[in-house]
Amino acid sequence: MNTNFVVGGWSSVLWSRLLLCVSLVFAFALPGCEKYDELVAKDQDCQAKWSDYEGELQRRSDLIPGLVETVKGASKFEASTLTQITQARADATSIKLQADDFTDPAKMEAFQKAQDKLSHSSLSRLLIANENYPQLQASARYGELMKQLEATENRVLRARQQYNNAVRGYNTELGKIKGSVVNKATGKPFKPRVYFAATAGSEVAPKVSF
């Protein structure tokens, strides 16, 4: 019996099986890697959209002190209302969300309520001031600041919607079978994010009318 032939035959079989195993590993691993990369990309898109949203919130926050001072100087506007606006601004800017908070409904709701309170409870009072205090209409600075505020509120709403769209795409991929399997296989580094829920009036920015 030719032992070289036997050894050679077994070597060929082993190599064939090894190649088959390697091929199977790549066949399953490659799509998994692609799905993992896709989840990473969508998660980063959510982070980018959130940064855009925070930027618009900061822009709004920066406008408010000037508005308060302008109203205070141009009219005998109720001091208590100006205090409420200032406090609402402080409350809205005091809540800082950490990475884990984006998956916590309670913390996201608290953040949203603080922002909505500033937009639709406090800043709306400044809009009423325009109607009740005609002298404000003669203030060019007040008019310019209010127009900037209206534009900023619209950008805030748009940024919020874009964040929700990014979260929807991310959560959808994470919820698919392949996304779920890859997430479990890699130690569950991805968690579903929380949407901004629509509240009454929050989908419409305060309107400036002169």
What do the predicted segments below correspond to?
Residues F5, S16-L20, A27-F210:
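A helix-centric hydrophobic-segment signal that preferentially recognizes long
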Residues W10, L24-F26:
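Short, intrinsically disordered, low-complexity terminal segments
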Residues M1-L14:
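N-terminal secretory signal peptides that target proteins for export/translocation
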